[in-house]
C-alpha cells in the first residue's frame, strides 16, 4: 500500500505541535530517513483562542483553520490531524469546507480506551474549559458506555492556569509546580471514581506523565500521533 502523507494543522500551541511530530517520529518503525513518513506541518500560532470562541463568543478560529487545511492539501497532504483538542469543537464546520479527511481526536482516544482497557467504564477528563463545557468529548465516550468525571470550577481554573503557563515561554513558576497542580486535579478525579485519566489538552502531556498517576493515562497527543502513523500506512512501534 502506498504510504500517505500526514498533514499537521498546528500552532495551538507550538510546543504541542513539536511534541506531536516528535511522537510520530519516535513511534514510526524506521531504520533509515527514507523509511519515515512524509509529514507536512502548518504551525500557525495566530489562530484565535479556541476556548474564548467556545465559551465567551470570541473570534471564530474556523476561517484560519480552514485556510490552514487548504494549505496542507495544496502542499500534498492526504489527511490532516489537529494536535489541539479544543479545536475539535469546530471539526464538523471545518470538515464541511475541505476535501481531505481529518482524524478526530475524540474518536481515536475513545477507540484506544475500548481496545486497550475495555474494563474501564469511568474516566477523568482534563482539558480546557472550552473542551469540558462543550461536552463533545463526554458525548463521544458516553456513546461507547464510558462515563466521564470532570473537575469542579475551582480545580478547573487550576487546569486552565496550568495550560496557559505551559504555553508561556516565561512562566512565573516551574514546570514541576505546574505538574503538581495537575496531579492534584487528577487525584481528585480518581477519588470521584475515575479509573483512567484522559489528557484532553495537548499541552497537558508535556508535564503530566503516566508515572505521576495511579491509574491508566490516556495521552490524547500520543494516541493521535499513533493513529496518524497507522492511517498513513504503517504500524506504530508498540
Predicted regions and their residues:
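Non-catalytic structural scaffold of enzyme domains
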Residues: 1-238
